[in-house]
């Protein structure tokens, strides 16, 4: 596609999100097929899906990274991001939602809302992303569209409303009644679902469809009370309401996040996908509808507002980094204002560093097309950025706006890693550096005492796949240790320290003197280091060295060497020596001072707590709950339907290694579980003592 101008109102930036195995990638594949982007349908279970382009994805049949692509439908340009449904890859969902204007949530018609669907929905709530829903797999045994709609209301608190009525069910599912147009749509199998026939509503469904349509109209009237004419028509003459009127009210309700219309179909059997494409265009917002962009000025911390205009100042967000063996480092960006041209010099305002764009690329999974410019509303990729990482703002050199960052969760699991041979040491370091740039939830640290390299991530599958990538993409063979819990340390009261670092050994000595005050920061806020030095007691040029020393000191705690979190440090006083003071001396002194202060501030160890959902046959419920209690679990609640029970609990990660295997033997292989990091909590005293002893 050439760089043709696209009216902003005709762009849709959408994500496809769901629980693992609800059929997200298959739905995206069908969208690409019907919109003419691919000529052959790729199947996930055959390992041929276009959007699952990494080898690991094709082998495992799951989506790991958010693949991006662009399609055209009904005169609109739709940028689609297909996100992973596995909890270990939550950051991919989080960073996609941050840059999207709307989303399609895909649900399994048999299971309805599953635990990971709740996580993704919560993330979308956080960023206020308007959503429509697609109940997929209507051809499966036990499929129930209306039960899925109800489960969205109950479990997600969504204002879910049916806009379809299925015709037939399970293997007899042949189409649906569109409650807005009041037409029955029958799909023709011989055209792979590309064509369908519109017929009258079947006699046996007429009464039900009339009730459903009235319920839909009533709901629309309720969410837009300012539209009195529409409300009057609903009450007095609902049959006189036109399709256009319904679409207008629905669009407004979706954009304002007041309603979540629910469609049905089966992507695998090619039914209902074009209807989904139609409403993506009709109901989901364009960048124009999302309105003003807010950010903070670097100069004075005041709030800045920008309108989404092509001729406005540039404001873009880097939301993903990818390393390509041929092109190098690729940065995915979303442009909120202005235009970005190939070859232009820009500012990374988050880091206050200048960057230059060498190439602009439009992406289709892992294929790419060169572009001369991207403009407001575009999602694309650029080559040449050296400093930018996930969550950084890119802007004009004179603009200096910083947009809201992407929230990055703390890793919960650690593994030691070492190269198989000495020759691989440098390659391993490069691979780890590239992978941690791509994925902010993957951290690489060194254990000072043992000299081991430790990798940390969101779960065993996460680290497993990254290890796979090291072997395949970076050709590095590495040995890894057993997974360990990623504990953290923090403080529980205020503390202070006065530290002098003095060395005299002939010639020039070393001198630094630093006074610190520390206090607990609010949970989840991270560490903050602030200089309150006045009157030049520590010269200005040494302050960054003190801050760096403090930050390095916080990397390993005082109880068991785990990183300190949620600590606020104020550098309040100190002194220096005209000759003997140096940056190195102040850095060492800063590190010693913060450690000393932490020892006086009642330090504790924190452990990751996981939120777990177990779905089990009711006759095994007692065993499952008993087992979770033995693992220091806290049962949050349970619910039952159709002979199956779901137990929700919070359990320390340290108790959950090998849980899948023991759950299998406990329930004869009939139960399933999903787990995700919830928060960090204080370790019981007895366990803390054991950890410190180790």
From Swiss-Prot:
Subcellular location: Cytoplasm
A GO biological-process term: ribosome disassembly
Sequence ranges assigned to domain tr-type G in this UniProt record: 9-288
A Pfam family: EFG_III
SMART domains: EFG_C (SM00838), EFG_IV (SM00889)
One GO CC annotation: cytoplasm
Domain of life, source organism: Bacteria
Residues at which GTP binds: 18-25, 82-86, 136-139
Main localization (coarse): cytoplasm
GO molecular function per UniProt: GTP binding; GTPase activity; translation elongation factor activity
Keyword field: Cytoplasm, Elongation factor, GTP-binding, Nucleotide-binding, Protein biosynthesis
Functional description taken from the UniProt entry: Catalyzes the GTP-dependent ribosomal translocation step during translation elongation. During this step, the ribosome changes from the pre-translocational (PRE) to the post-translocational (POST) state as the newly formed A-site-bound peptidyl-tRNA and P-site-bound deacylated tRNA move to the P and E sites, respectively. Catalyzes the coordinated movement of the two tRNA molecules, the mRNA and conformational changes in the ribosome.
Family: Belongs to the TRAFAC class translation factor GTPase superfamily. Classic translation factor GTPase family. EF-G/EF-2 subfamily.
Protein name (Swiss-Prot/TrEMBL): Elongation factor G
Natural source organism: Chlamydia felis (strain Fe/C-56)
């Amino acid at each position: 596609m050439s760089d043709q101008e696209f009216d902003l109102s005709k762009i849709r930036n959408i994500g496809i999100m769901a629980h693992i195995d609800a059929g997200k990638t298959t739905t995206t594949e069908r969208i690409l097929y019907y919109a003419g982007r691919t000529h052959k349908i790729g199947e996930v279970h055959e390992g041929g899906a276009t959007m699952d382009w990494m080898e690991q994805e094709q082998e495992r049949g799951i989506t790991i990274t958010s693949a991006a692509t662009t399609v055209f439908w009904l005169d609109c340009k739709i940028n689609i991001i297909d996100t992973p449904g596995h909890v270990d890859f939550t950051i991919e969902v989080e960073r996609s939602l941050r840059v999207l204007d709307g989303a399609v949530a895909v649900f399994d018609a048999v299971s309805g809302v599953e635990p990971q669907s709740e996580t993704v929905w919560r993330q979308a709530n956080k960023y206020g992303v308007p959503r429509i829903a697609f109940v997929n797999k209507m051809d499966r045994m036990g499929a129930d569209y209306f039960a899925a709609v109800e489960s969205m209301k109950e479990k997600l608190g969504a204002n879910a409303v049916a806009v379809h009525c299925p015709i037939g069910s399970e293997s007899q599912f042949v189409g649906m009644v569109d409650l807005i147009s009041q037409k029955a749509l029958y799909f023709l199998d011989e055209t792979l679902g590309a064509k369908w026939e519109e017929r009258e509503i079947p006699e046996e469904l007429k009464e039900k469809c009339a009730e459903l349509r009235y319920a839909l109209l009533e709901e629309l009237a309720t969410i837009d009370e300012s539209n009195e004419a529409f409300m009057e028509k609903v009450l007095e003459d609902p049959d006189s309401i036109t399709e256009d009127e319904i679409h207008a009210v629905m669009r407004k309700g979706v954009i304002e996040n007041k309603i979540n219309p629910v469609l049905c179909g089966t992507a695998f059997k090619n039914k209902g996908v074009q209807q989904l494409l139609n409403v993506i265009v009709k109901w989901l917002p364009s960048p124009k509808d999302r309105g003003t962009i807010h950010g903070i000025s670097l100069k004075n911390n005041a709030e800045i507002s920008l309108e989404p205009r092509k001729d406005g100042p540039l404001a873009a967000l880097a939301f993903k980094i990818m390393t390509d063996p041929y092109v190098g480092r690729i940065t995915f960006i979303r442009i909120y204002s202005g235009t970005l041209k190939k070859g232009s010099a820009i500012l990374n305002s988050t880091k206050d560093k200048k960057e230059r764009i060498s190439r602009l690329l439009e992406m289709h999974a892992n294929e790419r097309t060169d572009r001369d410019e991207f403009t407001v509303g575009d999602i694309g990729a650029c080559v040449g950025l050296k400093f930018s990482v996930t969550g950084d703002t890119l802007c004009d050199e004179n603009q200096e706006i910083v947009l809201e960052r992407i929230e990055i969760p703390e890793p919960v699991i650690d593994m030691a890693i070492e190269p198989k041979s000495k020759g691989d040491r440098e390659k391993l370091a490069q691979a780890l550096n590239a992978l941690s740039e791509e994925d902010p939830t993957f951290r690489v640290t060194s254990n000072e005492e043992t000299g081991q390299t430790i990798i940390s991530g969101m779960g065993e599958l996460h680290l497993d796949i990254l290890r796979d990538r090291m072997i395949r993409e970076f050709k590095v063979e590495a040995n890894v240790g057993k997974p360990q819990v990623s504990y953290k340390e923090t403080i529980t009261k205020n503390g202070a320290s006065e530290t002098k670092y003095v060395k005299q050994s002939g010639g020039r000595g070393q001198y630094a003197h630093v006074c610190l005050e520390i206090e607990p920061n609010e949970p989840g806020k991270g560490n903050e280091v602030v200089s309150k030095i006045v009157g030049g007691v520590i010269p200005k040029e040494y302050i960054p060295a003190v801050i760096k020393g403090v930050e390095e000191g916080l990397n390993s705690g005082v109880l068991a060497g785990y990183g300190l979190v949620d600590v606020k440090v104020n550098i309040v006083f100190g002194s220096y020596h005209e000759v003997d003071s140096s940056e190195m001396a102040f850095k060492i002194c800063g590190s010693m001072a913060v450690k000393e202060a932490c020892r006086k501030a009642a330090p504790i160890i924190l452990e990751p707590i996981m939120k777990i959902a177990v779905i089990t046959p009711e006759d095994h419920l007692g065993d499952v709950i008993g087992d979770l209690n033995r693992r220091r679990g806290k049962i949050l609640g349970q619910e039952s339907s159709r002979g199956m029970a779901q137990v929700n609990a919070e359990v320390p990660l340290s108790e959950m290694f090998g849980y899948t295997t023991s759950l299998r033997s406990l329930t004869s292989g009939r139960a399933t579980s999903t787990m995700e990091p919830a928060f960090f909590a204080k370790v019981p005293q007895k366990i803390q003592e054991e950890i410190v002893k180790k």
